[in-house]
């Protein structure tokens, strides 16, 4: 696991208040600009998670076409990019368009929750195709086994126009 965080104070706060463990063979923390890191690293990743906002909810370079193109270049053959977005921002639709452009249309954004947070996905490799009934069964098992309740998310997907026919395709 590689974590890139631009603010050293965020790393210190995570260690002090959220029990962020020390670096080891499984995890390294790099204090750097995420956009710069993705542009210059030679590492390949199966998964890239992007959740970068400043105090005014601005994303800076983390929501640009060059950044998304660089993310795609850094993903493995079956890689997945997951981006936290704010659907209430006026730039929201353009954010989705940039993702779709960088990934040749292989991007989608889940319906936002009441807070306005929306999670977008972009993929390389083979098509991702899941039946919503399977996702519901997995969500039930997770709730039973871990108390993590993803059933409201599956319910939002069931009412979403991109899941007509009971399939989630990316």
What is each model feature region?
Residues 65-129:
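C-terminal substrate-binding/active-site "lid" region of AdoMet-derived donor-dependent transferases
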């Amino acid at each position: 696991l590689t974590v890139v965080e631009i603010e050293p104070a965020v790393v210190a706060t995570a260690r002090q208040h959220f029990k962020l463990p020390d670096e080891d063979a499984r995890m390294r923390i790099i204090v750097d600009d995420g956009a710069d890191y993705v542009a210059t690293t030679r590492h390949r990743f199966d998964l890239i998670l992007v959740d970068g906002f400043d105090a005014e909810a601005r994303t800076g370079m983390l929501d640009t076409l060059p950044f998304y193109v660089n993310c795609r270049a850094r993903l493995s053959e079956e890689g997945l990019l997951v981006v936290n977005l704010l659907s209430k921002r006026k730039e929201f639709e353009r954010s989705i368009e940039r993702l779709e452009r960088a990934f040749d249309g292989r991007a989608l954004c889940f319906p936002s929750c009441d807070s306005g947070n929306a999670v977008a996905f972009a993929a390389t490799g083979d098509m991702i195709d899941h039946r919503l009934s399977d996702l519901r069964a997995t969500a039930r098992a997770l709730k039973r086994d871990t108390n993590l309740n993803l059933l409201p998310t599956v319910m939002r997907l069931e009412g979403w126009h991109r899941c007509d026919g009971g399939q989630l395709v990316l």
